[in-house]
Amino acid sequence: MQIQFHLYNTLTRTKELFRPQDQANVKMYVCGPTVYDNPHIGNSRSAAVYDLLYRILIKIFGSTAVKYIRNITDVDDKIIDRAELLGSTINELTDKVTQEFHINMEYLGCKLPSIEPKATEHIDIMIEIIERLIAKKHAYIADKHVYFNVLSAPNYTELSNRNLEEMFEGVRVENSKTKKHPQDFVLWKPAKPNESANMNFDSPWGLGRPGWHIECSAMSYKYLGENFDIHGGGADLIFPHHTNEIAQSRCAFPSSTYAKYWVHHGFLTVNGEKMSKSLGNFITVRDLMDKEISGEVIRLFLLSSHYRRPLDYNDKAIEDAKKTLDYWYRAIVNINLQKIDIIPNDFMQSLLDDMNTPLAVKIINDYARGVFTSTTEEEKKFNASNLITCANFIGLMNKTPHEWFNSGVNELYINELVNKRLEAKKQKNWLLADQIRNQLLEQQIVLEDKPDGTIWRKG
């Protein structure tokens, strides 16, 4: 039976049955980071959401049939400003931040995309598309800039579902006397005096660099062609970025529909407020790594809410994710797991229904509970195997219980204290034994006395 996968399409504002143009060549493009500063947890939500989508597509169509492109924006005004502030070269900054991004992705258990193109390596294609737009009267040259003529684009407001005036309310628009219309956006901008040569390129319109929107149109065209299946990104990109992508790509290639399914994830806040450096609540993945918050805890937190809903980062949410994973890992302690290749149907159906991760997590939790309430060894193994299979599918429970409960602790030091306590008990020195137990408890190390000795775990 054909697997049916439904996704909410921002373009049509309906949940649709996903039908790729070619089941042997499923194409997905996702907007990646602008590498000017360390990735924040908002970037991580995007990574986790589309990593899960990638896993689902692979499950349905096979790993060789799915092409996942996630770009790196390494040419941008923010990069220039940041490099000047740090006294760094452009390349030093972008290389360092890109490396940090990759470290973060590995920490969160995200699969590598099929291709991760850099904007600076595709300037020629951007120029090619801009020339097509000029030739078709959808773009014009003014004062060494090249602008896209928004009013020339059919159905410009289709993705945002708002009229033109509403779309630009509250949006910063670059004012220029050389523009034909205030809403027109830049495709190519000239180099500024004394600006870094690393951020500017030769073009038919002089030395300069591309606008942000043309970068994604060029890279998606290079690797996926005029038409592809899925385009992903945050809801904040619907306008202007994705709206402008659609306009310029469809105008450059008139027979193109560009992306068929537009999949957007919701906003991420911190303690109920928008994340910003001015509010002092700007949290990077590196901040969480330095606090020794497990990548699996962060990933479960990111997937705990439906991807289209807002998600709030707070200490309780992280603590809840940690407790949930502790519960799951505790369920498989001392169980000889049976490897199963079949994913339980109820779990898979939850993900096939617009990636309903809250329901998927509930189902995993039910399997964990089933382990503890099982009355037979066979039933216990069944629940434990389904637990680990489902959790693995969404990128969780990739450690043994021992690794999980003892991560980030000095095992030699703890074993010495456990042996010292054991000796104290033999000497009937109950006061010292209790002191050692309490000392370890303060370090979140829990002792369990068994007939054959004492075992410990991180609480």
Swiss-Prot record:
Keywords: Aminoacyl-tRNA synthetase, ATP-binding, Cytoplasm, Ligase, Metal-binding, Nucleotide-binding, Protein biosynthesis, Zinc
Motif ('KMSKS' region): 274-278
Principal location listed in the UniProt entry: cytoplasm
GO biological process, one term: cysteinyl-tRNA aminoacylation
Enzyme Commission identifier(s): 6.1.1.16
Intracellular or extracellular location(s): Cytoplasm
Cofactor notes: Binds 1 zinc ion per subunit.
Keyword Protein biosynthesis: yes
Top-rank taxon: Bacteria
Pfam families recorded: tRNA-synt_1e
PANTHER family linked to this entry: CYSTEINE--TRNA LIGASE, CYTOPLASMIC (PTHR10890:SF3), CYSTEINYL-TRNA SYNTHETASE (PTHR10890)
Family to which this protein belongs: Belongs to the class-I aminoacyl-tRNA synthetase family.
Protein name according to UniProt: Cysteine--tRNA ligase
Organism annotation: Rickettsia canadensis (strain McKiel)
Taxonomic classification: Bacteria, Pseudomonadati, Pseudomonadota, Alphaproteobacteria, Rickettsiales
